[in-house]
């Protein structure tokens, strides 16, 4: 099958530069996605064009400038590096695409099938460990849309999630373990937040997510297959079990929320301050929701989070990097592409 199947890796995307005009263009495409801000089109348009894009691009551009590399966007650079390493290990044609920005999914699929017309199938791997409406779901829908329009005779398969896959857990655990060798007071798992309504909208049962006590613990296969909250809790559970971390030494929080609607709690910035106020002097923070370092890890956690912790009385703040181009992650991702 390998000579008939190609692989498309898909990550989030990034502005082309730190120029506010490029950031504005990127934010428009990202935030106008109906799966990111899931309100009626006219409301979304008014919110984004009337409010957000008049204030956010300048602020976001300043944040991007703090973390921008000479080669470009860290997320793009790191995604390209890991892609090149994986490609050398996989005997299949491969392309890398982004959900938003110039490295579009349409461009990635077109390159894949133009260079390799013999392909009958594409395996698409979203670089998101956990399934969510605003990440994996929108990627799958966009790929299906392009395939139906431009490559209707080709077959599509995809990896929906890998939050509990053994090799991913092993790679995350090994990475974290390397940063826990020195004494620490608390470990905070910070995952990207999502609106609570995204969970209930995707729940195929209509009666489980956030509607029964301890919903993420009560077995419900259909709901949990698309439940971001359940999946991040499972990732955390598997990592702490593997490393033998006591229950009172770690907690879970959610970052990067937007105002105006309930998001998953507790919020990371609140948790960072709370832990410092409770006398935790040495904090380690990890974000397994991201496989490549990006604005949310390098700036939001690495800079803003550190400042918040130190200002609240903390003394040592350790941000664990993402898997990035670590060899065990490269081999894990290559395995997903091969099998």
Residue ranges and their predicted role:
Residues 2-339:
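Active-site-proximal alpha-helix that buttresses catalytic centers in soluble enzyme cores
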